[in-house]
Amino acid sequence: MLYDPQRHEPLGDVPWDERGARDWIARYAEHAQSTFSREHRWPTHPRDAGNDIGDTPCPMLYFGAAGVIWALDHLANARAIAPPDDFSQVVAELESRNTALTEPWGHGVNGLLMGNSGIRLLHYRQSVDRGAMDTAAAVADALAAGVAGNTGHPSLELLWGSPATMHAALTMHEWTGEARWADLFRADAHALWRAFVPADEAPCRLWTQDLWGRKQKMTGAGHGFAGNASALIRGRALLPADTWSAWADAIVETAHATALRDGPLANWVPEVPPAHTPPKMLVQWCHGAPGMVTSLAGLPDPRVDELLAAAAELTWAAGPLQKGAGLCHGTAGNGYALLKLFKRSGDPRWLERARAFAMHAMAQCDSMAAEHGQRRHSLWTGDPGVACYVWGCIAGDAALPNLDPER
């Protein structure tokens, strides 16, 4: 079987309610602002506390203050909520706090989701919005240095590595049009191609991730092939035509060669060869079919049409995740696969399914808040990411936070 039913739960039968969804987003935004403190920012949720952080309030995009502020700004810019409080002074402090927290972990400090590049993007945008152009220029220079310094990062994945800082360069290029960001993207793409080599374990190219003291060839969006491909697909217009053609062929080949099929369904093991027997059949954004869809849905190539549809069908058949509601390994992240296929195919059935996942994800958030006595203030694992997803279901917008074009 291509998924483990014990990791999933039945989809709720509450019908789509746009007014209720809008109210839920507004309530979360109000709660986030009312529970914020300058000293402690937002508390780390027990589900996010681990050996590296304990209950230390985190600064980064992934599950820290920068991510919550990013989500509030995003929702306000979409006019889903009223303009939030001014967090500019807080944002200016986050980089130093993040360096102090993450530098001892040994993965560098320049990553997008876990490192300082995501914080710098937020700081830059807020500085421009406030008209603080000298600050914005200094932050942009620091971001450019960080992107350049992250080239060749051994993790070769989205949380720490250069594929994610390629997304940062693309965002800055989309915002500013400056050539240096395109140059940084192309330099990283060149380095990625050199590392994307024919694998002994599969008839295709794969990257080898050097992370957590292990070397492994991972396939998913969070830590492997799919996530890396997403940056190249997003920035394909900045590459020479022959270079992009080679990339497109290789991406299509690897997606098919690593897929497991069962009739109309498709999924991927987290790594090649599988690390477990039997293999873990995960269905999450970070590992498995949902992240493959969100990462490759922007690939303008009919050779993946049927494969992506099969991956989305698997995501729908598996149902919501028991783990929770968030983006990385929760119901909302899986729902983005359905939204992406709606945007790619135009088939309204996928939007209906995405909205069903949205209703379930909101209920999961509320249930977890009641269980723990606090909201999960984390963009990629908690409520603000769900709020962004729910808004996407209202607006028909499939843009994934931090990894798709922003305003």
Segments predicted by a language model, with ranges:
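Terminal, non-catalytic domain-edge segments
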Residues: 1-31, 234, 238, 298, ...
